[in-house]
Regions:
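The substrate-binding groove and active-site-proximal loops of carbohydrate-active enzymes
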Residues: 93-104, 186-188
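Short, conserved phosphate-binding/catalytic loop or strand-edge motifs used
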Residues: 177-183
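Short, low-order "capping/linker" segments at domain edges
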Residues: 138-152, 227-238
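Acidic, His- and aromatic-enriched active-site or binding-groove loops in soluble protein domains
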Residues: 143-170
C-alpha cells in the first residue's frame, strides 16, 4: 500500500499540475422558511423541487430511503439542485461558469421559479445563514445512507465528549447541518500559487467576518456568525486540522501534503454501507489493522473493517479554506447572503484571486498584522457583536475599502464588468454593517427581514 503522503499527493496535489481554464464554482445553500412562523413542511419543499426538476429539465440523481428525489442534475450545465442535510435546506450548486453574470442569470431563474412554487404554500427560500424557525423545525437529516452516516457521526459527540480532548467544548447542536446555510466558492489554483493563495485568503478571513456575517442564534447573542462555532465545536473539530485555519501557513507542496496526511478521516464505505468512526489522523488510520465503525440499518450497528488505500477518497476537511481533489480552493466561511446580493461572495474571492500578491502585502503591513496578529483570533473577535471594541473603527473602514478596491481591480482586469457585484460590499464597509448587524438593528420584525432577504 502507498504511504499516506503518497495517497494525499495523488488525490490533492496531482490535480494542481493540470492546466485548467480558471472556471468558477458556486454553491449556495438557502433555508426554506415557513412564512407563518411554523415549522417547514417538507412536503411543500419536496413538491417545489419536483416542479423545478420538471421545469428546467433536470435529471433525478439521488433518492432517499422513501424514494424521494433529493438531488438532481442538469445534463447541459451540470447545475445541481439538492436538499443539503435536510428538507429544510435547499442548495443550488452551479456547474462551472466563466463569468459571474452567467452564474447570476441561472441563479435568478432557478430561485424565481422555486420561490413562486413555495409562495403558494406560504414558504420561501431566503438569504439567511440560519433558518429563523430552527427551534421548531424537524431536525431529521435526509433519510439516505450518506446523511444517516453524518447524522450518526455528529450525534456520537455525546458519547465522545468524555474521551475527546475537545469534548468539553462540544456544542449541543448536533443537527446544525439541517438549519445552517453557506455560500461557498471554488476557484482553480496550481502548484505555483496554492500556498500563497492559502496565506492571502487566511489573512483576509477576519475582514470577511465583518462583511459577510449573517447567522445569529438567540442563545448566542454575542455572535454575528455562528458558522465557525458550529463546525469547530462539533465532532468535526476533534482534530483541529480538520477545521479552522491552516496553522502554520504552508510554504511548500510538501508542507501541504504533510498537513493533510495528519488530518482525520471519519467515514468510509464497505459492502454498500456508509460507515462512521471516531476520527483518526489519516497516516495513523492506514497503519491500523482494524477499525471499529458503525452503519445504519434501522438502527446503528457496529461494523469492523480494515483500512484500504482507496479510503483516501473519504478524507475531507471542513476548514475556512479547503484544498479539494479537483485542483481548487474551496472558500467555506461565508454565510448565505441576502438573495439579491448572492454573488457578492463569489465576486469577492474571484477579484482577490487576481490580486494575491498585492493582497498579502496590503494585509501584512496593516494594523491587523504588522505586530504579528493571528487571523484565527482576529476572526473570532470580528465575529462578535462588540467587534468594534477590538479595533479602531476608522482604520478598519479604510482597510476594508482598500481590500475591496483591490478586489474591484482584479475583477475589472477580467473585462466582464463583474465589479458591479461588489457595490453592496462597499456600502457595508462604509457603514461597518453586515447582514447580521442589519437584522439585529431592525427592531425585531423578523418576517419583513425574511421577505427582504428573499427578494431578488
Amino acid at each position: 500500500m502507498k504511504t499516506a503522503k503518497e495517497l494525499i499527493f495523488d488525490r490533492f496535489i496531482a490535480p494542481l499540475q493540470t492546466s485548467r481554464a480558471n472556471y468558477i464554482g458556486i454553491e449556495i445553500e438557502m433555508p426554506i422558511v415557513n412564512l407563518n412562523g411554523e415549522k417547514t413542511d417538507k412536503t411543500v419543499s419536496i413538491a417545489a423541487m419536483k416542479k423545478a426538476i420538471e421545469h428546467f429539465g433536470f435529471t433525478p440523481q439521488k433518492f432517499d430511503d422513501d424514494g424521494v428525489c433529493h438531488e438532481a442534475v442538469c445534463p447541459d450545465t451540470c447545475d445541481i439542485f439538492s436538499f443539503d442535510c435536510s428538507y429544510n435546506n435547499f442548495e443550488i450548486a452551479l456547474g462551472r461558469v466563466r463569468t459571474l453574470h452567467e452564474a447570476q442569470a441561472r441563479f435568478r431563474d432557478y430561485v424565481s421559479f422555486i420561490n413562486a412554487e413555495l409562495y403558494q404554500n406560504q414558504h420561501t427560500l431566503t438569504g439567511l445563514g440560519v433558518n429563523p424557525n430552527y427551534l421548531i423545525n424537524d431536525f431529521n437529516f435526509v433519510p439516505s445512507p450518506r446523511y444517516r452516516m453524518l447524522a450518526g457521526y455528529l450525534k456520537k459527540a455525546e458519547v465522545w465528549r468524555s474521551i475527546s480532548p475537545a469534548g468539553s467544548d462540544f456544542h449541543p447542536y448536533y443537527g446544525f447541518g439541517t438549519f445552517s446555510s453557506a455560500s461557498q466558492v471554488q476557484l482553480d489554483v496550481n502548484e505555483e500559487n496554492v500556498c500563497q493563495a492559502i496565506e492571502a485568503f487566511s489573512l483576509v478571513e477576519p475582514l470577511k467576518a465583518v462583511l459577510f456575517a449573517n447567522s445569529t442564534l438567540p442563545e448566542l447573542p454575542e455572535l454575528l456568525c455562528v458558522r465557525d462555532y458550529f463546525w469547530e465545536r462539533s465532532a468535526h473539530g476533534i482534530n483541529p486540522r480538520n477545521v479552522g485555519f491552516f496553522k502554520p501557513f504552508p510554504k511548500s507542496i510538501g508542507e501541504i501534503t504533510d498537513y493533510l496526511s495528519k488530518a482525520s478521516i471519519f467515514c468510509a464505505e464497505r459492502d454498500g454501507k456508509y460507515l462512521f468512526f471516531y476520527p483518526i489522523p489519516f497516516d495513523e488510520y492506514l497503519n491500523r489493522d482494524r477499525i471499529e465503525g458503525e452503519y445504519y440499518d434501522g438502527a446503528y450497528h457496529p461494523f469492523r473493517f480494515s483500512p484500504e488505500a482507496e479510503d483516501v477518497a473519504y478524507l475531507r476537511t471542513y476548514k475556512q479554506i479547503d484544498l479539494t481533489a479537483r485542483g481548487t480552493l474551496e472558500f467555506r466561511s461565508a454565510c448565505t447572503q441576502p438573495l439579491h446580493q448572492a454573488m457578492t461572495v463569489a465576486a469577492f474571492h474571484l477579484g482577490l484571486m487576481n490580486r494575491i500578491e498585492a493582497l498579502t502585502e496590503l494585509l501584512s503591513r496593516s494594523f491587523l498584522y504588522r505586530e504579528g496578529g493571528d487571523p484565527d483570533l482576529l476572526r473570532r473577535k470580528m465575529n462578535r457583536v462588540d467587534f468594534l471594541s477590538a479595533v479602531e473603527p476608522e482604520a478598519l473602514k479604510v482597510l476594508l475599502l482598500n481590500v475591496l478596491t483591490l478586489c474591484a481591480e482584479g475583477l475589472r482586469e477580467r473585462g466582464y464588468a463583474e465589479e458591479l457585484y461588489l457595490e453592496p460590499l462597499f456600502e457595508r464597509a462604509k457603514t461597518l454593517t453586515s447582514p447580521s448587524l442589519r437584522l439585529l438593528r431592525h427592531g425585531g420584525d423578523l418576517d419583513s427581514v425574511i421577505r427582504e432577504y428573499a427578494a431578488l
